[in-house]
Amino acid sequence: MQKQPSPESLAPSAEPTKPPYSYIALIAMAIQSSPGQRATLSGIYRYIMGRFAFYRHNRPGWQNSIRHNLSLNECFVKVPRDDRKPGKGSYWTLDPDCHDMFQHGSFLRRRRRFTKRTGAQGTKGPVKIDHRPHRATSPDPGAPKTTTGRLCPFPQEVPNPKGLSFEGLMGSLPANMSSTTSDVRPQLPTGPKEMCSAKSGGPRELSEATSPSPCPAFGFSSAFSDAESLGKAPTPGVAPESVGSSYQCRMQTLNFCMGTDPGLEHLLVSSVPTPGSSTPSASHRAPLPLPADSKEPWVAGSFPVQGGSGYPLGLPPCLYRTPGMFFFE
């Protein structure tokens, strides 16, 4: 008895597998196998369907992919059809420079993406583009300085003038400062004995003459404020006698005002030389220790003048001393 074939064997064969070639390789094979190395779009379709059973069935999508690859890849060149030959559609051929697109002629391996080289017509454009930057960067030999001046508007080396240097400015300062300070420096009074000796004028005139001070409450004279300037910048024009006497008067005033020890005043008086005469004047004598009374005279001098409260004074009649204050009347 003969066995009947199984239904599985009667079933159609399995679906063919897709070939391992890209669409570019399929198009290249179709063009190379056609006469004249050129083929139309319909001829490419027929070649692919006749060789590979996978594309025989009308599967949508692959034909559109063939058209896209023909138009997008530069290795395929479109050649217009001759009017003398009947038919419709243009021919497609391979670019002559794409012979090495596949390795060893194998369509399975594509070497690299093909880029179309510039032809005879395309060389004119790049040549102009190349010449334009060459003209811009290579100036005429006759005018090299103008281009360098445009590129660098500022001079490369700027001379440093001596007048603007720091040393030049500081070198000229001492001369100017010395002349300015000598003019602005306050001149000390040449006759300091006038402040420490009695005058024939009344108390009101003496107070007006000796009281233009910034501290009217304490009655400091303007000469008292110059004590620091005298120690810092001595004036060569003042005699040593006048300097010593003025310094003694100022220190006496300061000591009486601040209430220091009277023993220091004897040291100050003894340290000051008096080249004028051997006997000290009334202004140079050491003051006597003062009691704690409210108002007392300094020293009994040779010019007794009636004060405001009836006390005889040895120094200017307008000077009085209280335990915490020294003022002019």
From Swiss-Prot:
Cellular-component GO terms for this entry: nucleus
Alphabetical list of InterPro entries matching this protein: FH_FOXS1 (IPR047364), Fork_head_dom (IPR001766), FOX_domain-containing (IPR050211), TF_fork_head_CS_1 (IPR018122), TF_fork_head_CS_2 (IPR030456), WH-like_DNA-bd_sf (IPR036388), WH_DNA-bd_sf (IPR036390)
Record keywords, A-Z: DNA-binding, Nucleus, Repressor, Transcription, Transcription regulation
Residue ranges of the region described as Disordered: 117-150, 174-213
GO MF terms held by the record: DNA binding; DNA-binding transcription repressor activity, RNA polymerase II-specific; RNA polymerase II cis-regulatory region sequence-specific DNA binding
SMART domains: FH (SM00339)
Subcellular location(s) of the protein: Nucleus
Portion annotated as DNA-binding: 17-108
Deletion phenotype: Accumulation of blood in the central part of the fetal testis. Increased ectopic apoptosis in periendothelial cells of the testis.
Pfam families hit by this protein: Forkhead (PF00250)
GO biological process terms held by the UniProt record: blood vessel development; negative regulation of DNA-binding transcription factor activity; negative regulation of DNA-templated transcription; negative regulation of transcription by RNA polymerase II; neuromuscular process controlling balance; positive regulation of multicellular organism growth
Compositional bias annotation for Polar residues: 175-184
Job description of the protein: Transcriptional repressor that suppresses transcription from the FASLG, FOXO3 and FOXO4 promoters. May have a role in the organization of the testicular vasculature.
Name of the protein in its database record: Forkhead box protein S1
The organism of origin for this protein: Mus musculus
